[in-house]
């Protein structure tokens, strides 16, 4: 693209304006990159903690696997795994929208306390904890993915500014400046030469 730019004063002015804009915007990009790095670190920690909680809840379920399969109480426990609604919102982090869980509504487990053993309450509690932590881990993973993708994109732009756009624009400004300077010197030389020829012709005409 730089080879297509004309070596003129107007082109020089435009390249100077372009460089000024690039150098003005770069600090903003670098700040966003730094903030995103912090947010990604936090998101990774949050996702890791959510996965650990989910896996711990799953282990609790496995520990009572035989009780979950008792035909007489399957229906009483089944609803504790059902999600009626996940209320999600989105918050803005460094200009990017990321999901946030506001509430997880589970189906009501309807069973008679008198007609079921006491351990049913424990199984229902474990079941609900398992489902809630599963949803939280999924949303935390989604948040992490979104922030990591944005960080990659911003990092690419910072690298583009630092390694390509600013150096190329700077080189083009120097190239145009050198060309204009050389042309100015050439023009001055040509003017002097023309004046010298005019003077010579004048002197020759006076001698004649």
Swiss-Prot record:
GO molecular function: ATP binding; proton-transporting ATP synthase activity, rotational mechanism; proton-transporting ATPase activity, rotational mechanism
InterPro entries listed in its UniProt record: V_ATPase_D
Domain of life of the native organism: Bacteria
Record-level GO BP terms: proton motive force-driven plasma membrane ATP synthesis
Keywords (A to Z) from UniProt: ATP synthesis, Hydrogen ion transport, Ion transport, Transport
NCBIfam families cross-referenced by the UniProt entry: PRK02195.1, V_ATPase_subD
Job description of the protein: Produces ATP from ADP in the presence of a proton gradient across the membrane.
Entry's family note: Belongs to the V-ATPase D subunit family.
Protein name as catalogued: V-type ATP synthase subunit D
């Amino acid at each position: 693209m730089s080879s297509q730019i004309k070596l003129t004063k107007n082109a020089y002015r435009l390249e100077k304006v372009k460089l000024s804009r690039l150098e003005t915007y770069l600090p903003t990009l670098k700040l966003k990159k730094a903030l995103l790095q912090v947010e990604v670190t936090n998101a990774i920690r949050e996702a890791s903690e959510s996965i650990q909680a989910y896996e711990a809840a799953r282990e609790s379920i496995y520990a009572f696997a035989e009780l979950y399969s008792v035909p007489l109480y399957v229906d009483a426990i089944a609803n504790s795994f059902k999600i009626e609604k996940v209320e999600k919102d989105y918050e803005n982090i460094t200009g990017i929208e990321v999901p946030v869980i506001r509430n997880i509504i589970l189906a009501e487990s309807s069973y008679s306390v008198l007609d079921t053993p006491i351990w049913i309450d424990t199984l229902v509690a474990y079941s609900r904890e398992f489902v809630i932590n599963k949803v939280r881990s999924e949303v935390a993973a989604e948040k992490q993915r979104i922030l990591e993708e944005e960080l990659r994109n911003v990092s690419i732009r910072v690298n583009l500014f630092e390694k390509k756009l600013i150096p190329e624009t700077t080189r083009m400004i120097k190239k145009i400046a050198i060309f204009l300077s050389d042309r100015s010197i050439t023009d001055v030389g040509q003017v002097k030469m023309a004046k010298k020829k005019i003077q010579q012709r004048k002197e020759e005409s006076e001698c004649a």
